[in-house]
């Protein structure tokens, strides 16, 4: 399991961040965030870590991914969708599911 066990892939990903410029934000599209009215953006300033899975080692449920949100950029993204005629929901409560972290 990549998140818990040492492997060449995990070591590569751990070192990758120091070799890349720090982004202002990262857009994540998640199939785990279902809404009834189309796409939605998260306006959370510090999204919670959501453990939306079952049957894995306890250590996986203890991982906390403390990535800052970017509400201003999320609003800009929502505005672009709306300018294209696509209604967009907004949520300040939604956290990051395991597809994101």
PLM-predicted stretches and their roles:
Residues 1-80, 84:
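A short aromatic-anchored loop/beta-hairpin motif
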Residues 73-101:
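Internal, conserved structured core segments that host functional sites
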């Amino acid at each position: 399991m990549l998140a818990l066990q040492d492997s060449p892939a995990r070591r590569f990903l751990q070192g990758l961040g120091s070799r890349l410029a720090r982004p202002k934000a990262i857009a994540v599209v998640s199939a785990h965030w279902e809404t009834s009215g189309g796409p939605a953006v998260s306006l959370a300033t510090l999204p919670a870590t959501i453990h939306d899975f079952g049957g894995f080692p306890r250590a996986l449920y203890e991982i906390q991914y403390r990535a800052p949100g970017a509400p201003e950029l999320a609003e800009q993204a929502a505005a672009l969708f709306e300018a294209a005629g696509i209604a967009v929901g907004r949520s300040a409560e939604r956290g990051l599911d395991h597809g994101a972290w």
